[in-house]
Amino acid sequence: MEKNKALDAALAQIERAFGKGSIMRMGSRSESEAIDVISTGSLGLDLALGIGGLPRGRVIEIYGPESSGKTTLALHAVAEAQKRGGTCAFVDAEHALDPIYARKLGVDVDNLLISQPDTGEQALEIADTLVRSGAIDVLVVDSVAALVPRAELEGEMGDSHVGLHARLMSQALRKLTGSISRSKTLVIFLNQIRLKIGVMFGNPETTTGGNALKFYASIRMDIRRIGSIKDREEVTGNQTRVKVVKNKLAPPFRQVEFDIMYGEGISKVGELLDLGVKAGIVEKSGAWFSCDSQRIGQGRENAKQFLRDNPDVAASIEQRIRAQANLVEAAMITDETETEAAD
């Protein structure tokens, strides 16, 4: 009894000093309230993440080689948040955002907040101010590699600045994490990859900005271009693979493949075909695709066109895929083990 009284007194003192809700019993948080998520714009990736999308109030890292689809994926998440009436911001440290392409992906560029900062410190201060406002739903930083510390910009070209970038990221994330959680802002950091020198065994690839982002990120996704999509001789898009390499909210290491079409973004009908085959909803016999004994096309591109022309069939397939989400997720884990064996 005395211990309980002492604990109650301590809790009351903490709440007086730091405000109500600063400490509580874990079970009292409305039955561990459901995670609020924002769709990635890819049905397959939403399923691979295990929670239906990207979680609000968390840090996300998307990394990969050049032209792999990092910015495209981030812009799809922005478009999905805007569809729900959310406010989004884009910190364009690379000074390379194309508003015409963003509009084609469904982004409302007229209401998208954009900043093109001069230094890494300025970019992260802007990000911190926006997050603390509590009015931003999605914040994208493109990219970590372009967050150049002020000292490096003001120095000479050959000067050595060992660890400066990593220290900047570490300090910023220590400062940002608490306000990101409180404001329920989804913060997406895009990152590039580099090769570590002298690595004889294991993967020589690493991301820029030190290790801080790896620790603070709740989800890390590795995005790669694995092939080209051609219409006769013309390349019209990329085949893309995304692997969830870290996930604090669901089992990690699931992967999904989808098409990114030039000028269109993620091909939703292509995903419906692939996921439909995995779930047994769409049957594939040779080059023919069929659904409920109805042939929908010979060859993947013809089947995709059929789904574009028949949105009711596409909606029916999507509904059934969502109803069999567990089956599709299990297939993603199987695909992962098969890919590793092939590698």
UniProtKB/Swiss-Prot annotation:
BP GO annotations: DNA recombination; DNA repair; SOS response
Highest taxon listed in the record's lineage: Bacteria
Alphabetical keyword list: ATP-binding, Cytoplasm, DNA damage, DNA recombination, DNA repair, DNA-binding, Nucleotide-binding, SOS response
One Pfam assignment: RecA
PROSITE patterns membership: RECA_1 (PS00321), RECA_2 (PS50162), RECA_3 (PS50163)
Listed GO MF terms: ATP binding; ATP hydrolysis activity; ATP-dependent DNA damage sensor activity; damaged DNA binding; single-stranded DNA binding
Matches recorded under CDD domains: RecA (cd00983)
Gene Ontology cellular component terms for the protein in this record: cytosol
InterPro entries: AAA+_ATPase, DNA_recomb/repair_RecA, DNA_recomb/repair_RecA_CS, P-loop_NTPase, RecA-like_C, RecA-like_N, RecA_ATP-bd, RecA_C_sf
Gene3D superfamilies, per database record: P-loop containing nucleotide triphosphate hydrolases (3.40.50.300)
Compartments, record wording: Cytoplasm
The family this protein is said to belong to: Belongs to the RecA family.
Protein role: Can catalyze the hydrolysis of ATP in the presence of single-stranded DNA, the ATP-dependent uptake of single-stranded DNA by duplex DNA, and the ATP-dependent hybridization of homologous single-stranded DNAs. It interacts with LexA causing its activation and leading to its autocatalytic cleavage.
Protein name: Protein RecA
